[in-house]
Amino acid sequence: MLCGGTSQPVDADEQIQKICDSMKPHAEAQAGKTFDVFVAKTYTTQCVPGTNYFIKVHVGGDEHVHLRVYKKLPCNGETLELSKMLQDKRHHDPLEYF
Protein backbone atom coordinates (compact mmCIF):
# COMPACT_ATOMS: atom_id res chain seq x y z
CA MET A 1 0.00 0.00 0.00
CA LEU A 2 1.28 3.45 -0.90
CA CYS A 3 1.34 6.12 1.77
CA GLY A 4 -2.19 7.53 1.72
CA GLY A 5 -3.28 4.84 -0.75
CA THR A 6 -5.83 2.12 -0.14
CA SER A 7 -5.10 -1.46 0.87
CA GLN A 8 -5.96 -4.44 -1.31
CA PRO A 9 -9.60 -5.59 -1.01
CA VAL A 10 -10.17 -8.40 1.49
CA ASP A 11 -13.24 -10.29 2.65
CA ALA A 12 -15.33 -8.47 5.23
CA ASP A 13 -15.24 -9.75 8.79
CA GLU A 14 -17.43 -9.29 11.87
CA GLN A 15 -15.90 -5.88 12.67
CA ILE A 16 -16.69 -4.57 9.18
CA GLN A 17 -20.25 -5.94 9.38
CA LYS A 18 -20.72 -4.09 12.68
CA ILE A 19 -19.59 -0.87 10.98
CA CYS A 20 -22.11 -1.52 8.19
CA ASP A 21 -24.87 -2.25 10.69
CA SER A 22 -24.28 1.12 12.34
CA MET A 23 -24.19 2.90 8.96
CA LYS A 24 -27.33 1.21 7.55
CA PRO A 25 -29.81 3.91 8.72
CA HIS A 26 -27.59 6.62 7.22
CA ALA A 27 -27.26 4.71 3.93
CA GLU A 28 -31.03 4.18 3.79
CA ALA A 29 -31.64 7.89 4.42
CA GLN A 30 -29.19 8.83 1.66
CA ALA A 31 -30.71 6.28 -0.76
CA GLY A 32 -34.28 7.23 0.13
CA LYS A 33 -35.25 3.58 0.62
CA THR A 34 -34.83 0.70 3.03
CA PHE A 35 -32.57 -2.28 2.45
CA ASP A 36 -33.88 -5.71 3.50
CA VAL A 37 -30.36 -7.10 3.05
CA PHE A 38 -27.22 -5.19 4.12
CA VAL A 39 -24.26 -7.57 4.14
CA ALA A 40 -20.63 -6.46 3.93
CA LYS A 41 -18.72 -8.43 1.29
CA THR A 42 -15.26 -6.89 0.84
CA TYR A 43 -13.44 -3.80 2.05
CA THR A 44 -10.28 -1.75 1.77
CA THR A 45 -8.83 0.80 4.15
CA GLN A 46 -6.98 4.08 3.80
CA CYS A 47 -4.87 5.50 6.60
CA VAL A 48 -5.61 9.21 7.03
CA PRO A 49 -5.86 11.15 10.30
CA GLY A 50 -8.20 8.29 11.25
CA THR A 51 -9.25 5.52 8.87
CA ASN A 52 -11.38 5.49 5.73
CA TYR A 53 -13.16 2.20 5.12
CA PHE A 54 -14.35 1.49 1.58
CA ILE A 55 -16.92 -1.29 1.89
CA LYS A 56 -18.83 -3.24 -0.77
CA VAL A 57 -22.27 -4.09 0.66
CA HIS A 58 -24.82 -6.51 -0.82
CA VAL A 59 -28.29 -4.94 -0.63
CA GLY A 60 -30.35 -7.65 -2.39
CA GLY A 61 -30.50 -9.40 -5.74
CA ASP A 62 -27.43 -8.43 -7.75
CA GLU A 63 -27.39 -4.94 -6.25
CA HIS A 64 -24.59 -3.57 -4.12
CA VAL A 65 -23.61 -0.20 -2.72
CA HIS A 66 -20.12 1.05 -1.95
CA LEU A 67 -19.71 2.93 1.32
CA ARG A 68 -16.92 5.22 2.43
CA VAL A 69 -16.98 5.31 6.21
CA TYR A 70 -14.61 7.55 8.18
CA LYS A 71 -13.48 6.46 11.65
CA LYS A 72 -11.97 9.24 13.72
CA LEU A 73 -8.79 8.80 15.74
CA PRO A 74 -9.14 7.62 19.37
CA CYS A 75 -8.21 11.10 20.63
CA ASN A 76 -11.22 12.42 18.67
CA GLY A 77 -13.68 9.83 19.95
CA GLU A 78 -13.33 7.06 17.31
CA THR A 79 -16.81 7.90 16.01
CA LEU A 80 -17.96 6.71 12.59
CA GLU A 81 -19.54 8.75 9.81
CA LEU A 82 -20.81 7.83 6.37
CA SER A 83 -18.74 10.08 4.13
CA LYS A 84 -20.14 8.94 0.79
CA MET A 85 -22.16 6.16 -0.82
CA LEU A 86 -22.19 4.94 -4.42
CA GLN A 87 -25.38 3.18 -5.54
CA ASP A 88 -26.25 0.94 -8.49
CA LYS A 89 -23.13 -1.19 -8.08
CA ARG A 90 -22.83 -4.90 -8.93
CA HIS A 91 -20.81 -7.75 -7.40
CA HIS A 92 -18.19 -7.55 -10.16
CA ASP A 93 -17.65 -3.77 -9.82
CA PRO A 94 -14.20 -3.09 -8.34
CA LEU A 95 -13.98 -1.43 -4.96
CA GLU A 96 -11.92 1.70 -5.60
CA TYR A 97 -11.26 5.04 -3.95
CA PHE A 98 -14.15 7.48 -4.32
From Swiss-Prot:
The keyword Cell inner membrane does not apply. Optimum pH is 6-7.5 and pH 6.5-8 for papain and bovine cathepsin B, respectively. Induction: By LPS. Slightly increased expression 24 hours post-injection in spleen and muscle. Ubiquitously expressed in normal and lipopolysaccharide (LPS)-stimulated tissues including brain, eye, gullet, heart, liver, muscle, stomach, kidney, spleen, pyloric ceca, intestine and gill. Residues 4-83 form the Cystatin domain. A motif (Secondary area of contact) lies at residues 46-50. One of its GO terms (cellular component) is cytoplasm. InterPro entries: Cystatin_dom, Cystatin_sf, Prot_inh_stefin. GO terms for molecular function: cysteine-type endopeptidase inhibitor activity. One of its GO terms (biological process) is innate immune response. It is found in: Cytoplasm. The keyword Cytoplasm applies. Belongs to the cystatin family. This is Cystatin-B. It comes from Paralichthys olivaceus.
